[in-house]
């Protein structure tokens, strides 16, 4: 079981540099490359810190390449020798230490949108994340189903059809997560039954959004056959069990409950908490003492 956190490291006080279109227009792709290299250097620094602190699961930032899919960015960044050199270093560490690395595209990457242009841009973003995760030696691209658009069953079908039309490389890495407002665990399992996408279970989202049906963990586990160790998300509500907002830390109660329901199932757990690595470290140490 590997425990991890997402993107930023509060102890290192890391930041990932972004770029405005106007600045890119004025300074050219050289500026995009400059910031990209700094972001990869930050990622490498975090990877080293994680290894020093026995954290073997990490979600890389989606913002490593500024303006990654914007038309102004005509830089073939994934083939740039400097990018290849630093990502080779990152990937070597990831592979040598069996660290799991994932990415999580943002809310505007919506495969099941009824608007073809939104789907087109979503696929572009997934292609960017696919290139990024391959260079980093990662394995997972986490995505939500999207919107219901007044007809949840049709929305599920659209997601499945869009998924099946993706490149084999993206399909190999894409995992579908239940969300906290619209698509329950049962819903994403329904989508899996259409297109075989693995299901990333988020226990806090389930607490906030469920139909009262008990979670079938064996069914979730089965969706990962051929895709490696299941990935699970955990967070604690800021002011209550079903508060959609994330607390700075994950509570001992919530973590122990997840371990209880998992039983003998081996899974990697992503902590989604405002205090990032600080939320993970106590539980890493706890597991190491067992």
Where are these regions (language model features)?
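Short acidic, Gly/Ser-rich segments with clustered Asp/Glu that frequently serve as metal-coordination loops
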Residues: 183-184, 204-210
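Multi-pass alpha-helical transmembrane bundles in non-GPCR membrane proteins
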Residues: 152-163, 174-178
